[in-house]
Amino acid sequence: MSRPLSDQEKRKQISVRGLAGVENVTELKKNFNRHLHFTLVKDRNVATPRDYYFALAHTVRDHLVGRWIRTQQHYYEKDPKRIYYLSLEFYMGRTLQNTMVNLALENACDEATYQLGLDMEELEEIEEDAGLGNGGLGRLAACFLDSMATLGLAAYGYGIRYEFGIFNQKISGGWQMEEADDWLRYGNPWEKARPEFTLPVHFYGHVEHTSQGAKWVDTQVVLAMPYDTPVPGYRNNVVNTMRLWSAKAPNDFNLKDFNVGGYIQAVLDRNLAENISRVLYPNDNFFEGKELRLKQEYFVVAATLQDIIRRFKSSKFGCRDPVRTNFDAFPDKVAIQLNDTHPSLAIPELMRILVDLERMDWDKAWDVTVRTCAYTNHTVLPEALERWPVHLLETLLPRHLQIIYEINQRFLNRVAAAFPGDVDRLRRMSLVEEGAVKRINMAHLCIAGSHAVNGVARIHSEILKKTIFKDFYELEPHKFQNKTNGITPRRWLVLCNPGLAEVIAERIGEDFISDLDQLRKLLSFVDDEAFIRDVAKVKQENKLKFAAYLEREYKVHINPNSLFDIQVKRIHEYKRQLLNCLHVITLYNRIKREPNKFFVPRTVMIGGKAAPGYHMAKMIIRLVTAIGDVVNHDPAVGDRLRVIFLENYRVSLAEKVIPAADLSEQISTAGTEASGTGNMKFMLNGALTIGTMDGANVEMAEEAGEENFFIFGMRVEDVDKLDQRGYNAQEYYDRIPELRQVIEQLSSGFFSPKQPDLFKDIVNMLMHHDRFKVFADYEDYIKCQEKVSALYKNPREWTRMVIRNIATSGKFSSDRTIAQYAREIWGVEPSRQRLPAPDEAI
């Protein structure tokens, strides 16, 4: 008789190895069936399409969790340096298809659903976008998570689990209307609540100075409960974690402040604490100094740092008891990347923990903090820079304000020592800005408290060093770096454009998916007639598919043989959707002037959301819809010109429109777009770019060759010269008849006959206070668009140029970006090694 098992041996039966899923069609069908009945408690008679989506999501998720647990076990064993990416936004989009792609489950799931009489694409369309971001900054964070997992980095994304993400945009009567994005209404199968890791976050209160140092007391406490989402790497069995915090009121919230009878009100008031994670602020590139937003910024930072320190102390020991007490090794085990200034309070918060709680002396704590933190800047627009009023910080975070003052004092002492007698430099570099309202400049705090500061495209990083951070660069040039943004080729090629990915793989194999530089091999096919034909065919299929989508969803008819001219991004004056509008009206006027002339047919599509309080951006949307109303109903125009506003632009819509684009509009005023990433997505998906020499466009043109790019307009130096001379819109208005005609049409109510003065604010801005100099680039833009049309008439030459663009887009993989962050900022080495699958021995 065998001896009884010891407790430890019994426990060993609880292992992920015994649960490893078999990834064949029969097993997937069985698991789908099990989840429909046992997880969702439905049978086929009452199951809705959403139930089928959830059953499939749970089936796919089963293949993630073994790898997820294994990955975290591996990190505990190896105790690598961990990377913490702190961001107020993660614009993830949908998860189902991305998970299937990265786990190599797509074909099997396709077949399984087909055998069950279900349509995979229909199920995928049911999933809500996780819209926890405004635009580029949040989407970048999502691409970075994908690349960090694919490169085997022990990385964690930390943010807020907003109950309501970016608003849904509805167009009504030509105007943008906002609707709440209740994305969690039906539940989220991809997240796992972790209530056992709930942490307290403190607000308000006051500081007491004791013999043991400063104490922050009488605070209000809000609890931060984490929800974890798995982030799979590409076919390497690595699954990292995105941890998002949700605000909860403590059980005794407000009860101690109430007299007898106040109980009900106290329970109702719990909402006030929980509002912290209620909604994403919908401002892109604009700072609005609201207390609730400051609470959100501190909330994510305070919870995250407690979590980081807990993991640092207990790491490699498989337990939650503190074991590491010495913080000397902290910067060797922890890297914190601040995605813009939104999580900048991590710097004073880490100082508070080290000095007040861990009793470290200031200089040592400051050394640890600086070596741990790094800061990414995303904008040079002055209205976007965070400058928090001192009175707000004093009330909400009194200890942090004291710490910021101390940081500032010591920092300015260093500046004074380096530049004796330069008083104005001290004023410019101070973290504290004097004025009617005293403010803290959060970018200055980030630079002082980080060992690395990076811009997100070469030209942007140069502008930082020469202009807004010039003084800081002169003090500490070694801190400043460039890390040109990138996009994940998994979502932005394999997932959204499988036809193109297949045509590429037939020629050069599949390795390009995790090594995008391999696309250069396509340069040898630029004269290959079969390849040219295949690339053109895929584009035409994508255009037909998107045209069918527009017809189905919006009842809009478009000509699939027209040039698809697309500008999709947040609506902002600096992105110059207005310049696009002026071109569209100019084209319309030319067609009307010579109705019998041949014009290359175009469908111009503009999409993007305007911040709810941004009047001019909302007027721009109204203008696009008004132009569409006139152009699309003019029989003289026919299908030679169509203007479409793409409603509710979001990640899942980008995945449909970008593969269908012929022309990508990247037309910001030179020196205003830090990088852009939409530009890269279009390039990778076989669109040609019309753009200014701004952001990453500069490097894209360099990679592809300027002759394969439609470049127009002022360079940064020209803009600077024009600023010195003084920009005068009237000069262009007087000199260019076609421009004058367009502006007269806008002024006279040609596009708004029922309300002739509807666009007076736009005209007034363009004529008298246009910071972004639309008229200065108008003429060159129109000429450049003529070159676009001329080339489009020659499909073979157009497609050859497309191939050259695709072949040179490898640099713009987020894998390259993240490998550079890893080596040059975080001090870790990326790895393409596979972890063992859950059913393999470690």
UniProtKB/Swiss-Prot annotation:
The modification Phosphoserine is found at residues 15, 430, 514, 747-748. It comes from Homo sapiens. SUPFAM superfamilies: UDP-Glycosyltransferase/glycogen phosphorylase (SSF53756). Homodimer. Homotetramer; to form the enzymatically active phosphorylase A. Its cofactor is pyridoxal 5'-phosphate. It comes from the Eukaryota. This is Glycogen phosphorylase, muscle form. The record marks 109, 143 as: Involved in the association of subunits. The record marks 156 as: May be involved in allosteric control. Transmembrane segments: none annotated. Allosteric enzyme that catalyzes the rate-limiting step in glycogen catabolism, the phosphorolytic cleavage of glycogen to produce glucose-1-phosphate, and plays a central role in maintaining cellular and organismal glucose homeostasis. Keywords: Acetylation, Allosteric enzyme, Carbohydrate metabolism, Disease variant, Glycogen metabolism, Glycogen storage disease, Glycosyltransferase, Nucleotide-binding, Phosphoprotein, Pyridoxal phosphate, Transferase. Belongs to the glycogen phosphorylase family. Its EC number is 2.4.1.1. It is an enzyme of class 2 (transferase). The modification N6-(pyridoxal phosphate)lysine is found at residue 681. The lineage of its organism: Eukaryota, Metazoa, Chordata, Craniata, Vertebrata. One of its GO terms (biological process) is glycogen metabolic process. Phosphorylation of Ser-15 converts phosphorylase B (unphosphorylated) to phosphorylase A. The modification N-acetylserine is found at residue 2. It catalyses: [(1->4)-alpha-D-glucosyl](n) + phosphate = [(1->4)-alpha-D-glucosyl](n-1) + alpha-D-glucose 1-phosphate.
